């Protein structure tokens, strides 16, 4: 199963398997119809008739939706009735084509049911009305999820963009300078290669406490980084601050880094606790995973930010499980330092040894008394 590099439980975006399965179904049905001995032109005519009937049923459904949308034409469509019609029925050329196809393909067929066209049309409208009243055509949860992901309509996707634009994009470009200033006043505490980033914690259960030491006593608050101020949304000199934490192992300091939770996860957790939001625990878990994946994709296209932070995604086991948040952070710190060393060694390997290069300009002097001409045909 495909999953993100952040955590095994975070899925990748949906692919095109549904359309591939539909293509296989189409092929199988055509083979079955061919084996039944029907002529190809009859198969094509019946296929077009049924396809036009299905689309005509969707047209009836769109008309029913239009009746409701006309009540909101000023608030939802800026007073444009044409926009309301397009939102419910789609392109008018398409609707007219479907009506013509329905009439055209109904005419040449023998009337096996002995029903006139108006009866057939009325029965089609009746079946569509019953489907609407009984909610027989509601989208499946997987279809709703796919549509929302494809159009960036999920709660988590909006939160991820808000977290990036309203926070990370403001503080991450200037983070190295603030860490450098901090090191000058605190004995170069954040000297490791992995300590020059902001580590953002992503618990998939959305449990975000305000005190990290309550989660793990081996995480100890040390200091705050130098403040960053910026004018934001009418607020003059808005203050942004980040905290430096020390990581302990067997009572001894083994590392330090700039650390914090992803604050939008608190909102997801609060929504799941409020009945007015209609947000279940399953919805919360799905949106938390999507939040992580969306933020990862956003940072991947932001070079000025992606090298200044690392996402620490984890899922605490059930009761009785052995999980240490400090050890999880240490693992990411060591991995970051290992990757930095690997990159540095790769850069060093492609650079020539300075001792092998000439230290100054050299003059190449010929032993001949007269200079040679540029032409070679004089010899």
Swiss-Prot record:
<dbReference type="GO" id="GO:0033116">
    <property type="term" value="C:endoplasmic reticulum-Golgi intermediate compartment membrane"/>
</dbReference>
<feature type="lipid moiety-binding region" description="S-palmitoyl cysteine">
    <location>
        <position position="88"/>
    </location>
</feature>
<keyword id="KW-0496">Mitochondrion</keyword>
<feature type="short sequence motif" description="pLxIS motif">
    <location>
        <begin position="363"/>
        <end position="366"/>
    </location>
</feature>
<feature type="transmembrane region" description="Helical">
    <location>
        <begin position="18"/>
        <end position="38"/>
    </location>
</feature>
<keyword id="KW-0564">Palmitate</keyword>
<keyword id="KW-0812">Transmembrane</keyword>
<dbReference type="GO" id="GO:0000421">
    <property type="term" value="C:autophagosome membrane"/>
</dbReference>
<feature type="site" description="Not phosphorylated">
    <location>
        <position position="358"/>
    </location>
</feature>
<dbReference type="GO" id="GO:0005741">
    <property type="term" value="C:mitochondrial outer membrane"/>
</dbReference>
<keyword id="KW-0256">Endoplasmic reticulum</keyword>
<feature type="binding site">
    <location>
        <begin position="238"/>
        <end position="241"/>
    </location>
    <ligand>
        <name>3',3'-c-di-GMP</name>
    </ligand>
</feature>
<feature type="region of interest" description="Disordered">
    <location>
        <begin position="338"/>
        <end position="363"/>
    </location>
</feature>
<dbReference type="InterPro" id="IPR029158">
    <property type="entry name" value="STING"/>
</dbReference>
<comment type="similarity">
    <text>Belongs to the STING family.</text>
</comment>
<feature type="region of interest" description="C-terminal tail (CTT)">
    <location>
        <begin position="340"/>
        <end position="379"/>
    </location>
</feature>
<feature type="binding site">
    <location>
        <position position="167"/>
    </location>
    <ligand>
        <name>2',3'-cGAMP</name>
    </ligand>
</feature>
<feature type="region of interest" description="Cyclic dinucleotide-binding domain (CBD)">
    <location>
        <begin position="153"/>
        <end position="340"/>
    </location>
</feature>
<comment type="function">
    <text>Facilitator of innate immune signaling that acts as a sensor of cytosolic DNA from bacteria and viruses and promotes low production of type I interferon (IFN-alpha and IFN-beta). Compared to other mammals, STING1-dependent type I interferon induction is strongly reduced in bats, suggesting that the cGAS-STING pathway promotes a limited inflammatory response. Innate immune response is triggered in response to non-CpG double-stranded DNA from viruses and bacteria delivered to the cytoplasm.</text>
</comment>
<dbReference type="InterPro" id="IPR055434">
    <property type="entry name" value="STING_TM"/>
</dbReference>
<feature type="binding site">
    <location>
        <position position="238"/>
    </location>
    <ligand>
        <name>2',3'-cUAMP</name>
    </ligand>
</feature>
<comment type="subunit">
    <text>Homodimer; forms a homodimer in absence of cyclic nucleotide (c-di-GMP or cGAMP). Homotetramer; in presence of cyclic nucleotide (c-di-GMP or cGAMP), forms tetramers and higher-order oligomers through side-by-side packing. Interacts (when phosphorylated) with IRF3; following activation and phosphorylation on the pLxIS motif by TBK1, recruits IRF3. Interacts with TBK1; when homodimer, leading to subsequent production of IFN-beta. Interacts (via transmembrane domain) with TMEM203.</text>
</comment>
<feature type="binding site">
    <location>
        <position position="162"/>
    </location>
    <ligand>
        <name>3',3'-c-di-GMP</name>
    </ligand>
</feature>
<dbReference type="GO" id="GO:0005789">
    <property type="term" value="C:endoplasmic reticulum membrane"/>
</dbReference>
<dbReference type="InterPro" id="IPR055432">
    <property type="entry name" value="STING_LBD"/>
</dbReference>
<dbReference type="GO" id="GO:0140896">
    <property type="term" value="P:cGAS/STING signaling pathway"/>
</dbReference>
<keyword id="KW-0407">Ion channel</keyword>
<dbReference type="GO" id="GO:0031410">
    <property type="term" value="C:cytoplasmic vesicle"/>
</dbReference>
<feature type="binding site">
    <location>
        <position position="167"/>
    </location>
    <ligand>
        <name>3',3'-c-di-GMP</name>
    </ligand>
</feature>
<dbReference type="GO" id="GO:0005886">
    <property type="term" value="C:plasma membrane"/>
</dbReference>
<feature type="transmembrane region" description="Helical">
    <location>
        <begin position="114"/>
        <end position="134"/>
    </location>
</feature>
<keyword id="KW-1000">Mitochondrion outer membrane</keyword>
<keyword id="KW-0449">Lipoprotein</keyword>
<keyword id="KW-0472">Membrane</keyword>
<dbReference type="GO" id="GO:0035591">
    <property type="term" value="F:signaling adaptor activity"/>
</dbReference>
<keyword id="KW-0406">Ion transport</keyword>
<dbReference type="GO" id="GO:0051607">
    <property type="term" value="P:defense response to virus"/>
</dbReference>
<feature type="binding site">
    <location>
        <position position="162"/>
    </location>
    <ligand>
        <name>2',3'-cGAMP</name>
    </ligand>
</feature>
<feature type="transmembrane region" description="Helical">
    <location>
        <begin position="43"/>
        <end position="63"/>
    </location>
</feature>
<keyword id="KW-0547">Nucleotide-binding</keyword>
<feature type="binding site">
    <location>
        <position position="263"/>
    </location>
    <ligand>
        <name>2',3'-cGAMP</name>
    </ligand>
</feature>
<protein>
    <recommendedName>
        <fullName>Stimulator of interferon genes protein</fullName>
    </recommendedName>
</protein>
């Amino acid at each position: 199963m495909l999953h993100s590099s952040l955590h095994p439980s975070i899925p990748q975006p949906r692919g095109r398997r549904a359309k591939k399965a539909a293509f296989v179904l189409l092929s199988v049905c055509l083979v079955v119809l061919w084996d039944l001995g029907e002529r190809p032109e009859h198969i094509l005519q019946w296929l077009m008739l049924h396809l036009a009937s299905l689309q005509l049923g969707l047209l009836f459904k769109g008309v029913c939706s239009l009746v409701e949308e006309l009540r909101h034409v000023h608030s939802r469509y800026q007073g444009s009735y044409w926009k309301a019609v397009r939102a419910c029925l789609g392109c008018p050329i398409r609707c007219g084509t479907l009506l013509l196809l329905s009439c055209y393909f109904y005419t040449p067929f023998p009337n096996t049911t002995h029903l006139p066209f108006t009866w057939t049309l009325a029965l089609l409208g009746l079946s569509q009305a019953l489907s609407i009243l009984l909610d027989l055509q509601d989208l499946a949860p997987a279809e709703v999820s796919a549509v929302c992901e494809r159009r960036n309509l999920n709660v988590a996707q909006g939160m991820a963009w808000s977290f990036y634009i309203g926070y990370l994009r403001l503080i991450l470009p200037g983070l190295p300078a603030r860490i450098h200033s901090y090191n000058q006043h605190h004995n170069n505490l954040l000297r490791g290669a992995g300590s020059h980033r902001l580590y953002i914690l992503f618990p998939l259960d959305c449990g975000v406490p305000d005190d990290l030491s309550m989660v793990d006593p081996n995480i100890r608050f040390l200091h705050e980084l130098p403040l960053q101020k910026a004018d934001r949304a009418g607020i003059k000199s808005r203050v942004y601050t980040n905290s430096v934490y020390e990581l302990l192992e067997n009572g001894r300091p083994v590392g330090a880094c700039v650390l914090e939770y992803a604050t939008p996860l608190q909102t997801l957790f609060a929504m799941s606790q409020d009945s007015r939001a209609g947000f279940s625990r399953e919805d919360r878990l799905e949106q938390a995973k999507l939040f992580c994946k969306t933020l990862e994709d956003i940072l991947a296209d932001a070079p000025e930010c992606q090298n200044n932070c690392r996402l620490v995604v984890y899922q605490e086991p059930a009761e009785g499980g052995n999980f240490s948040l400090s050890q999880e952070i240490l693992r990411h710190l060591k991995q970051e330092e290992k990757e930095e060393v690997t990159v540095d060694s790769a850069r060093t390997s492609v650079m020539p040894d300075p001792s092998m290069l000439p230290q100054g300009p050299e003059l190449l002097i010929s032993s001949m008394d007269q200079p040679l001409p540029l032409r070679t045909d004089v010899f």
